[in-house]
Amino acid sequence: MRCLENHDQPRICSFIKDPLALENFTAFLYFLKGTTLLYAGQEFCCTEIPSLFEKDVFHRTLGDISSWFVKLNQLKKTVLSCEDAFVGKADDKHDIAILERNDTKVRKLGIFSLKGKKADVKVEFLDGTYTNHLDGSSITVKNGMLSCNGKPIVLTFSVE
């Protein structure tokens, strides 16, 4: 199981304040292999750890990112495969995670700017223009580089 928060660690929104960084961390979580665990109230950007033994009402005034969870869950079910091989790399200079999943038919590339910042990123992906599965935008890979605008990117291409 993979999670950003649970009952014995601080809430992700208690230390990731930038919404774009949170969007990237959440997309990163879903791109990882394994079951994604969401902790109660995470969809409302809660910052306080709820009690395990007392009734606790979630404050819904901080935000509602449940629609983002729905989109990422759909990606996990339709684009990613439990049969994928997985490789993770990092661009430490720009705080960007570069993840690749690959089965025998489709390569999947995930670019996650963990600070929500723009940067040019070196990738091992064929030159061309691809559709970002997360927002429908066009992403161009040229000479093994792509431009990340700070938002998470998931690209695919067939290897058959």
Regions found by a protein language model. Name each.
Residues 3, 25, 68-72, 153:
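Alpha-helical packing segments of well-folded alpha/beta enzyme cores
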Residues 9, 31, 52, 59, ...:
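Substrate-binding and catalytic surfaces of secreted/luminal carbohydrate-active proteins
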Residues 46-94:
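Aromatic- and carboxylate-lined catalytic core of secreted/periplasmic carbohydrate-active enzymes
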Residues 89-124:
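Carbohydrate-binding surface patches
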Residues 124-136:
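Solvent-exposed beta-hairpin/edge-strand motifs
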